Each structure stands twice: as C-alpha cells, then as structure tokens.
Amino acid sequence: KDLVIEGKLSDYGLNNTPAALRKEKEMRFKKSKPMDSITDLDLNTLSRNVTVKEYRYGPLNPEDEKGSKKFWEDKAEMWDTTVEHAKTSRCSNCSAFNQKPATINKIAKAIGDQGKKIVKQSNIGFCEFFWFKCAGARTCDAWVGGGPIT
C-alpha cells in the first residue's frame, strides 16, 4: 500500500523531520504492512506527518485551549458544526482507532521500559486508516464515529 495518497511529504517544505524524509525515500521501493510502523519509529513518523499534512491530524497539544483554538475552529467549519461539537470527535472514539490489547501491548513493548506508562498517559492507539500510533485526544479529517476498536 502506498502511504502517501496525494503528494510526497517532501512537497510540504520545512515542517518535516529528517527521519521521516529519509524514510519516505526508502519506502519508494518497499512495501510495508500496516503494523510495521509500531516498531519502526521513522515509518510511524512519516505516516503521522503525512496525516498531519493531508488530513489535518492534530491539534499539536490538545490540552492547550488557546494554542489549538484555530485548529478546532477549522474542524468545526469543515464539519459545519460548533467548536464544542467538533471537539467530541476524537481519535479515542473513532472507528479506525485500534486499542485491542495485543496492539496496545505491541506499542508499549516497542516504546521500551516506559511503554506501558506512556501508552496509558497518552491514550495511544493505532490508526487503521493511516498506519501510525495515534493519540486519543487528537482527531483528523477522516474521523468516523463508533470507535474505538477494542
């Protein structure tokens, strides 16, 4: 499966990590499986960065009301709703948010010694749409109700 749908991450200028850009070049000639990005941090970062650019994954810091104000206003406008209602549509309740025990354990193990703590604190899951470790407090333009997958 091609990770980049409409463009290349390198098309987006300076807001990219060198590791993700290197992985993008490497992946031109390789195929990956959805869960490969759980153990490959560069692939995870590539998939996440593409989702930020193509599907407006965010906000950067969901707990920062002031800093994420424009993000939520844009989401509300896109979905033709109020900011308050848009804020109820999060990765944590998306149908593509995989929080099956086996998935969570694999994520925690890949993180390392503090994996279980980090997974719990950030409410991490795996995005089945875009193949990256996803924070439950965020959202994207592809959000679909009815989740998570448990």
Question: Could you tell me what each predicted segment is?
Answer:
Residues 19-22, 28:
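Terminal and domain-boundary regions
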Residues 5-8, 13, 28-150:
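Cysteine-centered metal-binding/redox modules
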